[in-house]
Design a protein with these regions (language model features):
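Bacterial N-terminal signal peptides
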Residues: 9-18
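N-terminal leader/linker segments that initiate helical-solenoid repeat arrays
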Residues: 20-70, 82, 511-514
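Terminal, low-structured helical/coil segments at or just beyond the last alpha-helical repeat
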Residues: 26-28, 474-514
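Short helix-capping/linker turns of helical repeat alpha-solenoids
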Residues: 55-58, 70-73, 89-92, 105-107, ...
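Hydrophobic face of amphipathic alpha-helices that form TPR/SEL1-like repeat modules
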Residues: 64-71, 98-105, 132-141, 168-177, ...
């Protein structure tokens, strides 16, 4: 735009009625006469022919001047409004739409939604797609006119037929959500497709969801990725988040996943902030980045993310990039619990136990157990069995350990076998011990091996003792010694084979042979 001089004239107020104005609206106050406007134009635009063309009644010139003043900022709003009014009142559709926008936003004129609606309606009479979209939307939302969604839909459909893409998107939304029409997902997809093809990012995002979820359309993750990518590249935060999530589930490159999570996180998408923080905290990309992880988890926590609060709790509990502070860790875990994260109850229980607060720990574990957490059920059972935080109660311990077993805890089978030994039910104890050993519980395998070696509760068998000992996969003290001892109990042929195998494992630093 040509330089606009920094002077403001004395405002001369005069009144003109608004074209198509509704009842009970104030007449438009136009600050300048045409003579004053032309004089000002010649100064501001340095004598451009545009000013004289506007003075001669050229509507395009009048609108062009108005538009340049409008773009120059609020200091020139009176001039923009005056030029827009002269052009609009003489039939300039662009000027009518600009005047409608000025009334809607209160720029250069008092904010007046009714006047805005009337000017958009005047422009719409010519079939202008944008104006039809605005009055359709205003009817849908009851802005500047009585809410009439049937009329709003009609205007939006007319606008969409004029190839105004935002109208197609709004119609897609209406048919998806049943806004002024019956829910019709097929229609919604059709309008979203029209809008998406025209480059509307929100339509691309919503259409991608239909492809990803297989609703109405055949499930097609490839097409969903294409649409998410288009919308993401246009800066659509939710599309960036959805793109990262889908790429991750499809086994896409982690650097691409992180890139889009980061873009969505910058756009304020809480889920992206949460996931990016957790990825960086775990070091999924090869190296943990605690400082950036903390930043994103803190932002997500402010947005109400339970997982982010849990992650912050872990950072403080373990001292990951910060000074270790269990007190702060507990605060974050407690917030996570308030937001529905059950795992945080287990963390609180663990911290309480480390602080010798077994009664407090039991309360946390009982709450998690009541919510169905297998690990918590097992821990409650153990605490009742050992009398930790409560009176020793083997009946209650048995109940919780059985619940843990029914939830799938193989470790609880081993614990329950120990309990049955306390209650002198060796048959049950050995049965559960064997089940736990077969499921890979190291303690059960070691105990079962010892029982076979000694013939306690089972028929004595050196080969079984040796076999169960060699099954232990975890690093355990004395396992190498015990396996050697059981090996010497075998007959000469088997003993030679077993000891050679043991020697090989030891020489190759087999973990269980420490």
């Amino acid at each position: 735009m040509t330089k606009i001089n920094k002077w403001l004239p004395v405002v001369a107020l005069w009144l003109l009625p608004t074209v198509g104005a509704a009842q009970n609206t104030q007449p438009l106050v136009v600050p300048f006469s045409m003579q004053e406007l032309v004089a000002r134009c010649l100064v501001d635009f340095e004598g451009q022919p545009l000013c004289q063309e506007a003075n001669n009644g050229d509507l395009n010139a009048q609108y062009a001047i108005s538009s340049q003043y409008y773009d120059a900022g609020s200091a020139y709003s009176d001039l923009a409004m005056s030029w827009a009014f002269y052009a609009a009142s003489r039939g300039s559709i662009p000027a009518q739409k600009q005047l409608a926008e000025m009334f809607l936003k209160g720029r250069g004129v008092p904010r007046d939604k009714v006047q805005s609606y009337e000017w958009y309606r005047t422009a719409a009479k010519s079939g202008d797609g944008e104006a039809l979209y605005h009055i359709g939307s205003m009817n849908m939302d009851g802005i500047g006119a009585i809410m009439d969604r049937t009329r709003g839909i009609a205007y939006l459909q007319e606008s969409a037929r004029a190839y105004w893409a935002p109208a197609a998107y709004r119609l897609g939304l209406a048919f998806e959500e049943g806004e002024g029409v019956m829910v019709n997902m097929t229609q919604a997809v059709g309008f979203y497709t029209q809008a998406a093809n025209a480059g509307i990012p929100e339509a691309q995002f919503r259409l991608a969801r239909f492809y990803e979820e297989g609703r109405v359309l055949t499930k097609d993750n490839k097409q969903a990725l294409i649409l998410y990518t288009h919308a993401a590249e246009l800066g659509h935060g939710n599309a960036q988040f959805a793109l990262a999530t889908l790429l991750r589930s499809e086994g896409g490159r982690l650097d691409e996943v992180i890139k889009w999570y980061r873009e969505a996180a910058k756009a304020g998408i809480v889920g992206a902030q949460e996931q990016l923080g957790l990825i960086l905290l775990r070091g999924d990309n090869g190296k943990a980045e605690y400082t950036e992880a903390y930043k994103w988890l803190a932002e997500a926590a402010q947005g109400g993310s339970a997982l982010a609060e849990f992650g912050l709790g872990r950072i403080y509990e373990e001292g990951l990039g910060v000074v270790r502070n269990r007190k702060i860790a507990k605060l974050h875990y407690q917030k996570a619990v308030e937001l529905g994260n059950i795992s945080a109850l287990l963390k609180l229980g663990k911290i309480s136990l480390s602080e010798d607060k077994s009664e407090e720990a039991l309360k946390y574990y009982q709450k998690a157990a009541g919510l169905g957490r297998m690990e918590a059920r097992r821990q409650v059972g153990l605490m009742y069995m050992e009398g930790s935080g409560t009176k020793k109660d083997l009946v209650t311990a048995e109940k919780w350990l059985e619940l843990a077993v029914s939830s799938g805890s193989t470790n609880a089978k081993y614990d329950l076998s120990r309990l049955y030994l306390l209650t002198k039910d060796e048959e049950k104890a050995v049965r559960l011990l064997r089940e736990a050993a077969e499921a890979g519980v190291a303690e059960a395998q070691i105990e079962l091996a010892a029982r076979y070696a000694a013939g306690r509760g089972v028929e004595q068998s050196a080969s079984q003792a040796y076999a169960w000992c060699m099954n232990v996969k975890e690093c355990r003290p004395r396992v190498s010694y015990d396996c050697s001892r059981y090996g010497t109990m075998l007959d000469e042929h088997d003993r030679e084979i077993s000891l050679n195998r043991l020697k090989f494992l030891q020489e190759n630093n087999h973990c269980s042979m420490h």
